[in-house]
């Protein structure tokens, strides 16, 4: 993965598939990107979720904050329909799913930690959970 130039697909191929989804990362690979950037925040149950915004409104069928929700609730939301019917039923992935995808496809991944509007307690949990995830 040391070839140059390094082209990063921001939130995956976000102009071709719904951002921050496995579909977007797969599409990035399909069009030749070897690296992608993705955003990580924390859900109410401590799950590390891949999402850019601090609400569900723009990119899912849900609304409001996810800081009080568990991943089982978030996983039920459609994160692709807003983009096109082709991606209906695409889901918000967990960070571990995205890292596993990058590893399996031998792609580089740039993880961006979101500001965590859920407050200091959740922000600390986010950093701790990421450290454990990345160390494991």
Role assignments for model-derived ranges:
Residues 1-136:
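Phosphate-group recognition and catalysis centered on beta-loop-alpha active-site segments
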